[in-house]
Amino acid sequence: MPRSLKKGPFIDLHLLKKVEKALESGDKKPLRTWSRRSTIFPNMIGLTIAVHNGRQHVPVFVSDEMVGHKLGEFAPTRTYRGHAADKKAKKR
């Protein structure tokens, strides 16, 4: 269910400060964050944000199609390695 339009988009203040600081300094290093719940704003376009997935920080390069989505959508938390193979089928 989307957030109410009356409330507006959410972004953590500490992440917003990091983004503004990176934009004014022109720094291209990835910004490390644990804030998966923050919405991607238009001023983040062109930055690389390292989003924590529970184990490591996944680098996410922000493009214009990502605006309005959450950072956590681009850093998957679960790895699927496939189901166990059938041992009977391998013997044949």
Swiss-Prot record:
One of its GO terms (cellular component) is cytoplasm. It comes from the Bacteria. InterPro entries: Ribosomal_uS19, Ribosomal_uS19_bac-type, Ribosomal_uS19_CS, Ribosomal_uS19_SF. GO terms for biological process: ribosomal small subunit assembly; translation. Pfam families: Ribosomal_S19. Disulfide bonds: none annotated. Keywords: Ribonucleoprotein, Ribosomal protein, RNA-binding, rRNA-binding. One of its GO terms (molecular function) is rRNA binding. Belongs to the universal ribosomal protein uS19 family. Protein S19 forms a complex with S13 that binds strongly to the 16S ribosomal RNA. NCBIfam families: rpsS_bact. This is Small ribosomal subunit protein uS19. It comes from Erwinia tasmaniensis (strain DSM 17950 / CFBP 7177 / CIP 109463 / NCPPB 4357 / Et1/99). The gene is rpsS.
